[in-house]
Amino acid sequence: QPLEDGTVTVSRANASYRFPSRIILIGAMNPCPCGYYGDKEHICECTPSQIRHYTQKLSGPLLDRFDIQIQVPRVSYQELTAVKKAETSAQIRQRVMAARERQLYRFQKMDIVSNGQLTHSMLGQYCPMTAEAEQLLETAFHQRQMSARSYDRLVKVARTIGDLAGKDTITAEYIGEALLMRNDNIAKAL
């Protein structure tokens, strides 16, 4: 529970001590032992049982605690050298700062400062959705057999995407984007 509660309790002999533990948990792993599963340019040499054994090293409950789970494919030479019009770091920084301000304003009367700190019971009040967004979320919940924790984290990511777009209501577009960043099937597919 330290990841959800933001505190660690250490119990010794006659006393218990609580310490703050608000962290950002980040992890990375190869898709298989050889690293080439799903690669378009290299052939994976792993057997299905090797891949399954490898991916089962991370438990479902641990994976559930990652808000964003994405596969990052190899970048081709053409993609690497292509000239693209993209947001500058300064533009992205401005959007992030504006989103943080929205969250601070939203939670000014609460004991929280960000969407990541929302509890399940707060989602209805602070994460209003369009009917289309709710329908997409319900469909995804059943199709992906999501846990309650996965559901909560998906909604919070969608709320943050809305904040980055400067919107108060979660749309189907934001749910869809959050679903793309919550690839619960990474380990299941292997």
Predicted segments, located by residue:
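Basic, amphipathic alpha-helical bundle interface domains used for macromolecular binding and assembly
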Residues: 2-189
